[in-house]
């Protein structure tokens, strides 16, 4: 038979941060008892209970994280997560038709892919699995197949690809302050006010100009670009810089998992492909 439980009933204990609670511990005894009786156990994801008995929700990625946490508590062989794709691909198969399904990938590489724009798994679930050494397998809900195994060990096939995958993020905007005085700590004076406003700064590039000044460029989420640009205009004026410039027609492309055995020239091949 089957038995269903809420997060509170199996005591998925969380902190008190409602809507974004973090899992502290899980009491697996109730689940173990049902499994020993031969029952299938169904546990509601995305929810837990705090020390005072209040129901909490785990926030973004909470359901995947619940599955990983249960697998860790039960010391399962692996945690299988079913999605709308066959597994983890070298890049988004909805954009690139000949993207290849990866048989295996390391936690580190999966974290990089997830943080750089790949949507197949939430970063939080991968971090949890890596911390507790729970092998993850991403499978399709609709098709048969072995999917992709995410683990600590790198698959050591002789014909390993040079890189694990390519991630891209369209939700980007580029901001530049030109003609910034070349003095120690100037990058912080440019970027600090943007970060202080709660805007996440991503890629940062600093270039030296011929006249002894610097150009400082960084990226933010496109939705935050207008607010960041207004802050940057004030910063440029206060620092005596030339001007602040905004560009919302950019995309971030990242090569992930450049292997130790990789042939030389990968960066040049990437630049050539984009030329």
What does each of the following model-derived ranges do?
Residues 147-275:
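A conserved regulatory-domain signal marking ACT and ACT-like small-molecule sensing domains
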Residues 129:
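Acidic-aromatic/histidine active-site loop/patch
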Residues 78-82, 136-138, 202:
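Short hydrophobic alpha-helical runs that function as membrane-insertion/retention elements
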Residues 1-126, 207, 219-221:
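Nucleotide/pyrophosphate-binding catalytic subdomain
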Residues 139-141, 145:
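Internal glycine-rich alpha/beta core junctions
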């Amino acid at each position: 038979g089957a038995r269903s439980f809420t997060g509170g009933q199996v005591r998925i204990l969380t902190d008190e941060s409602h809507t974004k609670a973090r899992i502290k511990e899980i009491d697996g005894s109730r689940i173990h008892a049902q499994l020993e009786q031969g029952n299938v156990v169904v546990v509601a994801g995305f929810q837990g209970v705090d020390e005072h008995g209040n129901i909490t929700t785990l926030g973004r990625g909470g359901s995947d994280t619940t599955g990983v946490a249960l697998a860790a508590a039960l010391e399962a062989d692996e945690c299988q997560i079913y999605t709308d794709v066959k597994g983890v691909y070298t890049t988004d198969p909805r954009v690139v038709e000949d993207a290849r399904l990866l048989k295996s990938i390391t936690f580190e590489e999966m974290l990089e892919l997830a943080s750089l724009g790949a949507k197949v798994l939430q970063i939080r679930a991968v971090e949890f699995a890596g911390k507790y050494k729970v092998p993850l397998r991403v499978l399709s809900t609709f098709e048969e197949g072995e999917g992709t195994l995410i683990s600590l060990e790198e698959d050591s096939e002789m014909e390993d690809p040079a890189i694990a995958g390519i991630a891209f993020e369209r939700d980007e905007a580029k901001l530049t302050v030109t003609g910034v005085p070349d003095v120690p700590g100037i990058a912080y004076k440019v970027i600090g006010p943007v970060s202080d406003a709660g805007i996440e700064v991503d890629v940062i590039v600093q270039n030296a100009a011929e006249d002894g000044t610097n150009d400082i460029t960084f990226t933010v989420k496109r939705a935050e670009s207008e607010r960041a640009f207004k802050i940057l205009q004030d910063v440029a004026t206060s620092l005596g810089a030339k001007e602040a410039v905004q560009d919302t027609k950019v995309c971030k492309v990242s090569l992930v998992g450049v292997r130790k055995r990789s042939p030389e020239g990968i960066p040049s091949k990437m630049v050539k492909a984009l030329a």
